[in-house]
């Protein structure tokens, strides 16, 4: 366990382009001794990951801005700003921004470590406000396969 305080300023953290979105790693497993990590995802219109499963992480999604369509075990949930969606391990899920506005979601991952997959599969970017290109089908499949 770490005993260091970490402060991440606005638009701070490591920014990773993945699945056509920007994942900003605010707190990583190195900061929390592996207990949890926190990632802010900027989900651009029509963005979001393919359906996937995590086998070890609990994921908590808190919608900060905009609206996302979550599909959780085949059930669709429209999550607007202020909505929290908790997804335990072994549950197929995805989310998509079906609007024409940027959506932002804060994601708590426990235990930590999934953020390393984002770094492995995605591309680091310096400006978290610019929409990245869509991810290739090969990279998207690798993301879904490795995330499990």
Residue ranges and their predicted role:
Residues 104, 116-130:
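A hydrophobic, small-residue-rich beta->alpha segment in the mid-to-C-terminal subdomain
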Residues 1-35, 130-148:
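A short, N-terminal "cap"/entry segment at the start of jelly-roll beta-barrel domains
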Residues 8-9, 74-92:
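Short acidic-glycine-tyrosine-enriched beta hairpin
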Residues 23-28, 39-54:
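Conserved short histidine dyad/triad with adjacent acidic residue
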Residues 25, 38-40, 60, 76, ...:
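Conserved hydrophobic/aromatic beta-strand scaffold that supports enzyme active sites
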């Amino acid at each position: 366990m770490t005993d260091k305080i970490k402060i991440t300023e606005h638009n701070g953290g490591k920014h990773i382009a993945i699945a056509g979105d920007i994942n900003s790693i605010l707190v990583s497993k190195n900061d929390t001794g592996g207990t949890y990590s926190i990632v802010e995802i900027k989900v651009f219109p029509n963005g979001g990951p393919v359906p996937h499963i995590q086998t070890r992480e609990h994921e908590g999604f808190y919608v900060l801005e905009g609206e996302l369509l979550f599909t959780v075990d085949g059930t669709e949930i429209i999550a607007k700003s202020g909505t929290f969606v908790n997804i335990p391990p072994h549950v197929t899920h995805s989310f998509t921004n079906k609007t024409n506005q940027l959506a932002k979601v804060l994601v708590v991952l426990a235990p930590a470590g999934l953020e390393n997959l984002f770094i492995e599969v995605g591309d680091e970017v310096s400006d978290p406000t610019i929409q990245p290109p869509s991810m290739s089908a090969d990279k998207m499949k690798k993301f879904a396969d490795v995330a499990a």
